[in-house]
């Protein structure tokens, strides 16, 4: 393991990473960390460095909401905490496994923060808050990405969902929306290359930061967040099934929301790609998917016979609407290249990453990464205004 960490030849590291698909996960993880070390600051591999003490935080908040506070370790640092709830017996093997996954994620996010294309925040470590009730929670602690001036305005964080819905914010021009889409697609590809799943992409997990007094900001500097369910793509890893949630389910692949499969289907990269496709629809229309859903239900109600009882609109019906009519509406707004990239995310990705008897899961996933880079990342790079 130490020999791999010390390896400095990027080509050799890439070979080891590929071999790690079939060999032990630890080899692949070590090669990934070493590859990041070649272009970033040293990774704090010590668990003690990453397990942050509760007493050093100014406050922690009373619920599971994303929380901005200060962390003191020699100097005062403005931080953002994202919480993950867990119901695991203390001092159990299961808890050790779970915390190790959180620590691996913290290492990855710390190492990748110096690589702009990852679009992730610098993760300082994790906080295991066993005092929280009714269940324990673990927090991923991120450094706020803007310098804090004691006399300047405070840093404000807002989401892509806020950005689209806030009336006081001007709609970004077309070139900025192209750049936003391109940055998000590239970030997801980099996450795939690091052999991780995100599992919770949605507009509330795309963050922006500003120190402007009026709270305005640019949309071209997004940060991926919301790694509640994130894990490495190894089948040996502990996995948490996302709970049913009306907002999040609008971004999830139909197989992840159907009652017959949502609790049993193994997670695949194509599910993250599908979620990106929904984000690209929102960026293209500059309209949140929950607003689109509300309008869709209103259309159905209006079309129903007057005085009749309107049946609930199933999610599957809305998902078909997103993949058809909403995608078709993009060509006028964003052009053919952008629209085809969205089509890949919502349609072609399922075929490229499908599990068929002739294609192993590993080979299918690798093919998907290659096609995603070619048909989405590279194509979005061609979009200009």
Name the predicted role of every residue range.
Residues 1-29, 33, 114-122, 127-130, ...:
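Helical subdomain adjoining the active site within ATP-dependent kinase catalytic cores
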Residues 186-197:
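Protein kinase catalytic-loop region centered on the HRD/HxD motif
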Residues 202-256:
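Activation segment/activation loop of eukaryotic-type protein kinase catalytic domains
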């Amino acid at each position: 393991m130490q020999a791999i960490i010390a390896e400095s030849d990027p080509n050799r590291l890439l070979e080891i990473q590929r071999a790690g698909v079939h060999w032990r996960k630890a080899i692949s993880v070590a090669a990934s960390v070493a590859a990041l070390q070649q272009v970033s600051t040293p990774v704090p591999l010590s668990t003690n460095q990453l397990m942050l003490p509760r007493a050093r935080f100014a406050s922690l908040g009373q619920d599971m909401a994303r929380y901005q506070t200060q962390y003191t370790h020699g100097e005062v640092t403005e931080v953002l905490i994202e919480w993950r709830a867990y119901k695991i017996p203390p001092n159990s093997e299961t808890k050790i496994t779970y915390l190790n996954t959180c620590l691996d994620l913290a290492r990855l996010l710390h190492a990748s923060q110096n690589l702009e294309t990852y679009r992730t925040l610098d993760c300082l470590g994790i906080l295991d808050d066993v005092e929280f009730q009714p269940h324990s929670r673990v927090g991923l602690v991120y450094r706020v990405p803007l310098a804090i001036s004691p006399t300047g305005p405070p840093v404000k964080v807002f989401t892509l969902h806020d950005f689209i819905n806030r009336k006081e914010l001007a709609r970004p021009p077309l070139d900025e929306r192209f750049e936003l889409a391109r940055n998000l697609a590239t970030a997801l590809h980099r996450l795939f290359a690091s052999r991780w799943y995100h599992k919770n992409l949605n507009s509330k997990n795309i963050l922006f930061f500003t120190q402007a007094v009026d709270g305005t900001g640019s949309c071209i500097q997004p940060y991926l967040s919301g790694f509640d369910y994130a894990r490495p793509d190894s089948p040996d890893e502990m996995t948490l099934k996302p709970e049913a949630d009306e907002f999040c389910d609008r971004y999830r692949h139909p197989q992840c929301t159907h009652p017959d499969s949502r609790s049993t289907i193994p997670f695949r990269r194509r599910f993250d790609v599908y979620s990106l496709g929904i984000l690209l629809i929102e960026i293209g229309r500059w309209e949140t998917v929950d607003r689109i859903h509300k309008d869709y239900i209103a259309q159905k109600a209006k079309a129903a016979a007057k005085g009749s009882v309107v049946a609930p609109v199933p999610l599957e019906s809305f998902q078909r609407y997103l993949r058809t009519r909403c995608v078709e509406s993009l060509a006028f707004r964003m052009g053919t290249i952008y629209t085809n990239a969205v089509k890949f995310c919502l349609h072609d990705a399922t075929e490229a990453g499908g599990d068929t008897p002739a294609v192993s899961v590993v080979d299918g996933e690798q093919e998907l990464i290659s096609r995603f880079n070619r048909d989405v990342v590279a194509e979005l790079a061609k979009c200009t205004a």
